[in-house]
Amino acid sequence: MESKKFRTPSQSATVIVGTQFGDEGKGKLVDYLSDKYDIVVRYQGGANAGHTICFDNKTVVLHLIPSGIFHKGCVCVIGNGVVIDPAALLDEIRKVEELGYEVTGRLFISHNAHLIMPYHKLLDSLHESAQGDQKIGTTGRGIGPSYEDKFARKGIRVVDLLNPEVLKEKLRENLAAKNKLFKNIYEKEEIDVETMVREYEDFDKIIDPYVTNTQLYLNRQLQEGKTVLLEGAQGCLLDVDHGTYPYVTSSNPTSGGASTGSGIAPNYIGKVIGVCKAYMTRVGNGAFPTELLDETGERLGKIGHEFGATTGRKRRCGWIDLVALRYSLTINGVTEIALTKLDVLDTFEEIRICTSYMLDGKEIHDFPTDHQTLSRVTPLYTTLKGWMASNAHARSFSEMQPEAQNYVTFLEDELQVQVTFISVGPGREETVFR
């Protein structure tokens, strides 16, 4: 009897994850790789994350639409794990079209993605203000409250925009509860239901061309041999399950979140590329063992232009932390590393690398994810000689300064993962592939 032949998943999906506290430079890598993939997918987060892309003497920041939209042969998908501010999305679509790029037919939005409504943003700012010294440091974009409604099974989804009667009923239900909070807890004016219904009554016509069942679309495209690049927002150390809780985001930026946030079956995922800066930054509150509260930290921030792409907030800066990186590489199953912003270190005579921590008089090599313990550790450093010159001309590893090569090799030896992508400047072409 002849044996049957069944389809075997191709593992032609690649995930890009941030391995630090976000802002690692994922946008540049996605932009660089997008012309090598058929589809680029955003799988979690919302407009709280900005991906900065530099090309053709332009600098563009995208918050929701994947960076691949600037590669004309690439299809872009906003997955079910993303929370979407409809007004922000339409503004972004207009911005991309004004730059001369077609969006209709190239952008698909999951019908199951949840929406950020105006009351989510108001709740976000009111709740954050009420926290006093215990603030998380949210962006105030309504991300957390939208995810809260999602998991409380009260959320409004993209598909609801296409049915005005369903949308109206869900808005009434949500505002009945939210207005009690505004009036009785926060002593704010209630939001008028009918006004909000009118605000969203035309969204069905505008957004309908982009909406589809992206879970089925993506899996079918993979079955047909197409390649998919999945881009996360934020970073592993901000993951709600695996990060420095409670100073985390409300979603899963880790590689596991790529599957749940897109609907792509896990066995289609082949490579996981972990993106990390050559130093480290963090926005908002929370433990940061290698933070530099001195002139060196200020210098890193100034050279690296470390201000949030979404909020404009100043980022806290410090040396690279290999204890945290080892943890991130492990839980994400990272197969290769993309090292960004190496050029920021070009003028430092010495570069310090955290290789372990001291905790209660003992050296430890494992990253503590509970905030109380992490806030008590002291970093232990190895110091390397700086290269004191630019690598912007380099297009191969051998063309880089010897001390810069030594820095990269040291990271590889410590982390036991190859660095395959090195950003030596902000431009698309200022990149070394190995």
Curated annotation (Swiss-Prot):
Pfam families: Adenylsucc_synt. It comes from the Bacteria. GO terms for biological process: 'de novo' AMP biosynthetic process; IMP metabolic process. IMP binds at residues 23-26, 48-51, 139, 153, 234, 249, 313. Keywords: Cytoplasm, GTP-binding, Ligase, Magnesium, Metal-binding, Nucleotide-binding, Purine biosynthesis. Its EC number is 6.3.4.4. It is found in: Cytoplasm. Mg(2+) binds at residues 23, 50. One of its GO terms (molecular function) is GTP binding. One of its GO terms (cellular component) is cytoplasm. Its cofactor is Mg(2+). GTP binds at residues 22-28, 50-52, 315, 341-343, 423-425. Pathway: Purine metabolism; AMP biosynthesis via de novo pathway; AMP from IMP: step 1/2. The active site is at 23 (proton acceptor), 51 (proton donor). InterPro entries: Adenylosuccin_syn_GTP-bd, Adenylosuccin_syn_Lys_AS, Adenylosuccinate_synth_dom1, Adenylosuccinate_synth_dom2, Adenylosuccinate_synth_dom3, Adenylosuccinate_synthetase, P-loop_NTPase. SUPFAM superfamilies: P-loop containing nucleoside triphosphate hydrolases. Its main location: cytoplasm. Binds 1 Mg(2+) ion per subunit. Disulfide bonds: none annotated. It catalyses: IMP + L-aspartate + GTP = N(6)-(1,2-dicarboxyethyl)-AMP + GDP + phosphate + 2 H(+). Belongs to the adenylosuccinate synthetase family. Homodimer. Plays an important role in the de novo pathway of purine nucleotide biosynthesis. Catalyzes the first committed step in the biosynthesis of AMP from IMP. PANTHER family: ADENYLOSUCCINATE SYNTHETASE. This is Adenylosuccinate synthetase. It comes from Pelodictyon phaeoclathratiforme (strain DSM 5477 / BU-1). The gene is purA.
